[in-house]
Amino acid sequence: MLLLISPKNIEEAKEAIAGGAHIIDVKNPPEGSLGANFPWVIEEVKNITPKNLLVSATVGDVPYKPGTVSLAALGVAVSGADYIKVGLYGTKTYYEAVDVMEKVVKAVKSVDKNKIVVAAGYADAYRVGAVDPLIIPKIARDSGCDVAMLDTALKDGMSLFDHLDEKLLKEFIEETRSYGLKSALAGSIKKEEIAILKKLGCDIVGIRGAACSYGDRNEGTIQKELVEELVKLCE
C-alpha cells in the first residue's frame, strides 16, 4: 500500500521525502479538506522531489462549475503535479460529478496523457450536501479518471471509519478495482487504522494529521520520524 503524505509547504515536503513517503501531496489545509495550494508551491515541491517519487496536488473542494474546475486542474497539471485530485464538494448528483470530472480529465490529459486524475468524494458527504461517497467509483469510471478516493469534508475529529464501516470500505475498494482503477482512502486516519486499510486491499492511504507534531493537521507540522513510522506500517 502506498503512503501519500500531504505537506502544505516546502519545509514539510522535505520532511515527508526524508521520511520515505511514496507520494508527496501538496495541499493547503486552511482552504479546506482538499484545499488548493499555490502553483509556485507545487512547482517548488516538484523541483525538490526525487524523480522516483510522484507529486500530487489538490484542485480544491470544488463547486459545480466544470469550466472553472477544469481550468484550475490544468493549472495543477502544468505546475508539475503527477496526481491531480478534485474534491467533489459542490456536486450533488452523479451527473454533476461526472460532468465536472469529464472536463477535468479532458483538460489534464491534453497536457500529458500520463497524468493521473483522482475523483475524490467525502465519507461525510451527508453533512455538507455533497455527492454520495459510494458512487465515486462509478463516477471515476464513467468520467475517465484513474483513481477513486474518499476523504472527510469536515476535520472535526471524526475519521473515515466514523462514517463508513469496514464492509462498505471493502465494497468501495473492490468495486474500484473491478473497474481497473486504483483506490485511495483518507480522512483523519490514525496510525492503528492503517493495518485495517491494508487488509481491505486499499492501494493508497492519504495522511496528514498522523504525520504532524501533536497529531494536529492545522497547528502541527509534518515530522520525518512520524512519516517513517507510517511507511513501515504500509509495507
Curated annotation (Swiss-Prot):
GO terms for molecular function: carbon-carbon lyase activity. The active site is at residues 27, 85. Coiled coil: none annotated. Its EC number is 4.2.3.153. Pathway: Cofactor biosynthesis; methanofuran biosynthesis. Keywords: Lyase, Schiff base. CDD domains: Aldolase_Class_I (cd00945). It catalyses: 2 D-glyceraldehyde 3-phosphate = 4-(hydroxymethyl)-2-furancarboxaldehyde phosphate + phosphate + 2 H2O. One of its GO terms (biological process) is methanofuran biosynthetic process. It is an enzyme of class 4 (lyase). It holds the Pfam family 4HFCP_synth. Catalyzes the formation of 4-(hydroxymethyl)-2-furancarboxaldehyde phosphate (4-HFC-P) from two molecules of glyceraldehyde-3-P (GA-3-P). Belongs to the MfnB family. This is (5-formylfuran-3-yl)methyl phosphate synthase. It comes from Methanococcus aeolicus (strain ATCC BAA-1280 / DSM 17508 / OCM 812 / Nankai-3). The gene is mfnB.
